[in-house]
Curated annotation (Swiss-Prot):
Residues 382-466 form the KH-like domain. Associates with the 50S ribosomal subunit. GTPase that plays an essential role in the late steps of ribosome biogenesis. It comes from the Bacteria. Pfam families: KH_dom-like, MMR_HSR1. This is GTPase Der.
């Protein structure tokens, strides 16, 4: 089992900074702002070849109210999941009543706890850590997470011995058993390499990255928790509850997924806090990183311009799409009909995306989402042969010939796959770059119908073959040169 390490402490003591330092990423949002982290965030770290899992948590200060209560609950869950707890305190702020309350709870859980005093840069470590010994947590390790000072010593002194203790003692084998094990391992390795060489890359072997995006307070985290069957992320009736993108692995029907719960995206003019700007960037990065995007829309508020703006970013990113109309419960039939009419009117240009009407709070319709998700992913990653793509191109050309350009008919020669997720079809021919947009849309829709592609956009790219005689002058052959010489000689004599 890989050891699990939880980072616990008051708000703004540097837990996310240490998380980024240990995982060597910038996955956790960091700013000088209490309460920035609200959900449990998981990451992998390594000490001398030994892996362990790091959990970043929201702060606990004992005065939680409203959404902060949920944040504290996430931290308590992380403590229960952990093998080691790094209890972080702020050396600059000194010992606080909330630190004593957290220490009391940790002692009651009987977890292996290490007291870490952060923000000791520029200070005398012995002097600033003296007060924290009164917590009764043993040795105090002084670090400066933002600069990395003391972090390596912390890892080697605390975490590495724990990881090594987890490694089982090797079992003594006889010489015959060692030889048999060696040849069995060698045979298995050769067989695996042969199979790997024979088998093509199979996207079905990879987990589907599923991003849940939308405006603030449309129910993204509620939907995430409903899918997972636990309160994995903080849910509260207040816009902006989620501030970071949370990656959560899960398995459903023997298929692996990675759920990405994101922060809400508002109009640019309303994004004022620096923290929120970082959150929006994280959301847009999550869309780029995802395979399939669930765009959650509040059915009671209808489709806004911001929904369309977010939709445009998803399409420009080439991501597969499933539209989710949340909060469908409680709407009258008349309102539901109006919402559907609005969808047909404003989203008619993306007829390839499945639309689901659900209630994340009560769970109605949520189970049907994954059928559309797997369909969209399969269509986006399906391999299609050059022969098939060329045949479809020829059928489309026979049904509706390309138009004339400057008096000449555009000629389509052949087509092949240019990429996947989204599917890209590259068409070669003469004057293809002069094709009007209407004919390009015709080809795109023809490929979509022929390949039965749903849930993902298709991109068509055109390439023209180079003219081999473009910059070449006509040169006479040796025979032609001899004839020319005789002709010139004859003309001179005749004069």
């Amino acid at each position: 089992m890989i050891p699990v390490v939880a980072l616990v402490g008051r708000p703004n003591v540097g837990k996310s900074t240490l998380f980024n330092r240990l995982t060597r990423t910038r996955d956790a949002l960091v700013a000088d702002f209490p309460g920035l982290t609200r959900d449990r965030k998981y990451g992998r770290a390594e000490v001398e070849g030994h892996e362990f899992i790091i959990i970043d948590t929201g702060g606990i200060d004992g005065t939680e109210d409203g959404v902060e209560t949920r944040m504290a609950g996430q931290s308590l869950v992380a403590i229960e999941e952990a093998d080691i707890v790094l209890f972080m305190v702020d050396a600059r702020a000194g010992l606080m009543p909330a630190d004593e309350g957290i220490a009391k709870h940790l002692r009651s859980r009987e977890k292996m706890t290490v007291l870490v005093a952060n923000k000791t840069d520029g200070l005398d470590p012995d002097m600033v850590t003296a007060d924290f010994y009164s917590l009764g947590m043993g040795e105090v390790y002084a670090i400066a997470a933002s600069h990395g000072r003391g972090v390596t010593s912390l890892l080697e002194t605390v975490l590495l011995p724990f990881v090594q203790d987890e490694i089982e003692e090797p079992v003594e084998l006889t010489e015959e058993e060692e030889n048999a094990a060696y040849w069995a391992a060698l045979e298995a390795e050769e067989q695996a390499s042969e199979e790997e060489a024979e088998d093509d890359f199979n996207p079905e072997d990879l987990p589907i990255k599923l991003a849940i995006v939308g405006r603030p307070n449309v129910g993204k985290s509620t939907l995430t928790n409903r899918i997972l069957g636990e309160e994995r992320v903080v849910v509260y009736d207040m816009p902006g509850t989620t501030r970071d993108s949370i990656y959560i692995p899960m398995v459903r029907d023997e298929r692996e997924y990675i759920l990405i719960d994101t922060a809400g995206v508002r109009k640019r003019g309303k994004v004022t806090e620096t923290v929120e700007k970082f959150s929006v960037i994280k959301t847009l990065q999550a869309i780029e990183d995802a395979n399939v995007v669930l765009l959650v829309i509040d059915a009671r508020e209808g489709i806004s311009d911001q929904d369309l703006s977010l939709l445009g970013f998803i399409l420009n990113s080439g991501r597969s799409l499933v539209i989710v109309m949340n909060k469908w419960d409680g709407l009258s039939q008349e309102v539901r009909d109006q919402v559907k009419d609005t969808l047909d009117l404003r989203l008619g240009f993306i007829d390839f995306a499945r639309i689901h009407f659900i209630s994340a709070l009560h769970g109605s319709g949520v189970g049907n989402l994954f059928e559309s998700v797997t369909e969209a992913y399969s269509c986006a990653t399906r391999r299609v042969s050059t022969a098939m793509l060329t045949r479809i191109m020829q059928m489309a050309s026979d049904d509706h010939q390309p138009p004339l350009v400057r008096g000449r008919r555009v000629k389509l020669k052949y087509a092949h796959a240019g990429g996947y997720n989204p599917p890209i079809v590259v068409i070669h021919g003469n004057q293809v770059k002069d094709l009007p947009d209407s004919y390009k849309r015709y080809l795109m829709n023809y490929y979509r119908r022929s390949l039965e592609v749903m849930g993902t956009p298709i991109r068509i790219q055109f390439k023209e073959g180079e003219n081999p005689f473009a910059e070449k002058r006509n040169k006479l052959t040796p025979t032609q040169l001899r004839k020319r010489k005789r002709l010139m000689s004859h003309l001179k004599k005749s004069k």
